[in-house]
């Protein structure tokens, strides 16, 4: 059985220590999962992972992230930080944003990215685990606005694999760029719940 698990490259933002990485790496591998693909050595990126069709995606995703020791930044509603969840959100790496701010959510995120020397922003482009009719453009607009690349990952439940699909530098022309991004997923993904697979991915799944 393939037990490949990458070592985090030196320019990628890191978290944790050797002990925590080994614990979560071994937990990830013990579940029969592994990685495929070369992990890019980039200080800044928007990282997307698809398909998102189940809550269990978060479990495999977070055990992989903690095993890698990568620091992924997620943005969430500022009101969540007024609840008992605040310590957990801070530990995960969630940054508060105001959805009704005048400058807009996307621009808030871009502005924050521009203050950081290293940052990987994590996003699920479907925006929901249930079947989405379209892929939300937020991840793309953030990458274009911050002038950073997109790194693509996929869940492949049939083979218990997380694929790293490579790096895509957006041109600013959304529709053709999205087609290229989605085409990189062909043959490299399978959802936990096929009935909830986003429509743009349905005709790209390997039969």
Model-found features: residue ranges?
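Catalytic core of membrane glycerolipid acyltransferases/transacylases, capturing the structured
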Residues: 38-100, 157
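Short glycine/serine/threonine/alanine-rich loop segments
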Residues: 33, 70, 94, 147-148
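Helix-to-loop junction immediately C-terminal to a conserved catalytic motif
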Residues: 16-52
């Amino acid at each position: 059985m393939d037990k490949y698990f990458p070592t985090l490259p030196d320019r990628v933002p890191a978290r944790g220590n050797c002990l925590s990485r080994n614990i979560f790496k071994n937990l990830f591998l013990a579940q029969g999962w592994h990685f495929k693909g070369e992990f890019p050595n980039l200080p800044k990126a928007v990282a997307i992972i698809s398909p998102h069709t189940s809550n269990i995606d978060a479990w495999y995703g977070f055990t992989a992230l903690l095993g890698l020791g990568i620091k992924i930044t997620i943005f969430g509603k500022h009101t969540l930080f007024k609840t008992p969840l605040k310590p957990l959100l801070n530990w995960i790496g969630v940054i508060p944003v105001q959805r009704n701010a005048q400058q807009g959510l996307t621009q808030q995120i871009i502005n924050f990215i521009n203050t950081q020397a290293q940052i990987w922003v994590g996003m699920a482009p479907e925006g929901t685990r249930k079947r989405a009719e379209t892929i939300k453009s937020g991840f793309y607009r953030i990458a274009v606005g911050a002038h950073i690349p997109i790194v693509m990952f996929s869940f492949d439940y049939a083979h218990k694999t997380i694929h790293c699909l490579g790096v895509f530098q957006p041109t600013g022309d959304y529709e053709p760029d999205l087609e290229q991004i989605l085409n990189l997923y062909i043959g490299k993904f399978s959802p936990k719940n096929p009935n909830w697979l986003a429509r743009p991915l349905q005709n790209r799944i390997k039969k």
